[in-house]
Structure formats: C-alpha cells, structure tokens
Swiss-Prot record:
Transmembrane segments: none annotated. It comes from the Eukaryota. One of its GO terms (molecular function) is hydrolase activity. GO terms for cellular component: cytoplasm; cytoskeleton. Pfam families: Actin (PF00022). The lineage of its organism: Eukaryota, Metazoa, Spiralia, Lophotrochozoa, Platyhelminthes. It catalyses: ATP + H2O = ADP + phosphate + H(+). It comes from Echinococcus granulosus (Hydatid tapeworm). This is Actin-2.
Amino acid sequence: MADEDTAALVIDNGSGMCKAGFAGDDAPRAVFPSIVGRPRHQGVMVGMGQKDSYVGDEAQSKRGILTLKYPIEHGIVTNWDDMEKIWHHTFYNELRVAPEEHPVLLTEAPLNPKANREKMTQIMFETFNCPAMYVAIQAVLSLYASGRTTGVVLDSGDGVTHTVPIYEGYALPHAILRLDLAGRDLTDHLVKIMTERGYNFTTTAEREIARDIKEKLCYVALDFEQEMITSTSSAILERSYELPDGQLITIGNERFRCPEALFQPGFLGLEATGIHETTYNSIMKCDVDIRKDLYSNTVLSGGSTMFQGIAERMQREISSLAPTTVKIRIAAPPERKYSVWIGGSILASLSTFQQMWISKVEYEEIGPSIVHRKCF
C-alpha cells in the first residue's frame, strides 16, 4: 500500500461506472454509477435539506423521484458541469482527499476528440488545483493488469468498445478500431425486446432496472440459431426477475438476444462489424509477423465482457475467421470489470512513470495542449 498522504489517485471515468482509488492498491476504493440525478418533483417539506442534484449511489437510491443523466456518452464527456460534480463527489465524498495534494491519473477511450482530454486537463489543474495529472488509454491499462506486454485488448464498457493491438509495449495506433456499441446500447436493446412481452421501461429510473436484468440474467449463446430453436421448443431458458415492487416478470430468449447484438450489430440497426470481426480486423491491420502473438493473446476487459459464455463464443468466431493453423487464446481474467483501474494503479505506482506526469508548472507554461505531447 502506497503512502496515502501523497499517493497518486487513479480515476477510471467510465460511461457507466466511475472507479476510483489510490495507486498501489489492488482494487478501487470507490465504485459508483456515473450518474447525476435531479428531482423531477416539487419539494414540499421544509427543512428536509433537499439538494438540487445527487451523484452516484445516492442518485441511484433516490432514482424513483429523480431524472437521471449520464454526463459521459460513448466515452466522451457531453456535460462538463455534471462531470465536475462527479469528480468533486469522487474526491471529497468517496475518497475523502484534497485533490491539490495528489497527482491524478485519468483514463480515456482511444480515438476520442482531442478537445475532450484538453478540457479534462484544464478542469483538473484549474478547478481542482492538482499538482500533476496524466491521461492514459483504457485498453493499454488493461494489458498492464493482465501482466502482458503484447496482445490485442477488446475493451467493452458501457459507452464504447475498442480493440487495441499492443506489441512489446507499443500501441499500434493505425490498427486501433473503435465501435460505439456497448453496454448502454445493449440495455436499450433489452428494453425494446422486453416490450414484446408487454413490459414497459420508460423512465430513466426504470432503465436502471433493465440494466440490472441485463447484468444478472443475460448470457451469450455459443450458437445463436440453435439457442433460438431451443427457446421456442421449451421453457428451459426462462428465468423470472423480481421488480422493486415485488412483481415477478419472466424473461426467456431475451436473455441471449440482448448481448447477441455485440456479435450482430445489425440487431440495433447499426452498420458495423461485430466484436469478433472488429478484433480480427484489428489484428489484420498489423504486420504479418506479429499477428500470431496477437491471436494467442486476446484479452477481454470491461463490464460488457462479463456475460457468461462470451469468451467461448469469441474463441469460436475468431477461429472461423483466422487461418486454421493459428493458435487462438482468449484471456478473460475474472477481475476484468476493473482491469482498467488495476492497470492504472500499477502504472501510477511505477518509479519509471514518475517523470511522465504533467506538472502544474508545465501546464501553466504551455496550456491544455500539453496533454497531447506528454500522453500517448
């Protein structure tokens, strides 16, 4: 455990969940939804101390009376005021630290607009007065966490999915592919196919229930067509879910139809390739000499790779695309939900990393654009 008084803070700001903690720890201290909620009703009880906004778990627990908004969409911050609230909440309520005393490592999806990381840098230095900060690419951190220096990372979270091939520690930027199809789109898809059974999830609070159903009951079918046949001929795949008011609902083939969209984006009306093909295309954009190593080191990371059966399905799909002689290994570490954060914790505590930080002095000399020069 690093000395907490000066330890770097690692914040993985996902589109769905924010993971935060101290560098050198093996797991994040705080994991909470990246949500800002505002009351949608008039407050009538005087002296209740009602707030005009709630963040994270508190917003989640009061969701019945709030309108919930996610300030990060597809890995890009769309509402900076709310984003500041989330960071403020992270520092002062979750970690209980003074940001002006700690260097901060933030994470970002690859191929994000440049303005996004400039603004992140600006807020860290100007609003929170951090002494130093750094922005790291999410997939690279996941590879650190898996203990590899070579591999292709398929990182799929709530807002964005991307494949990043890395060879001997070098990211190959020309081969990075990004797919704006992730957990939130799957939740939307589940909401849609549940209406066929007559279940309606309309409010922002009810969407959270759909997300919970997705996380608890959905799985990836090894053979989608076969699974569909099984589900029509018997009730073996049906499960029931208890709503917060005690009502029971039944869910059948929706359990695997929802995550199937990862492999067949056409289900969502998207003209994109599935995650298996995206991974394969990413590998094919690399030099012919390094492909073999990438095939045998495919690493899954992020919450949307937590579906049961996803590793087996990836293995099967990539095997059918790749040359027959190639050995394909899909690594799905059990802690992959947090592997970006864990990688950040490893990186920020390396002695060799200490000269990589962007210091406040450098920022004041050069301005927000320094982030492109010092961070990959």
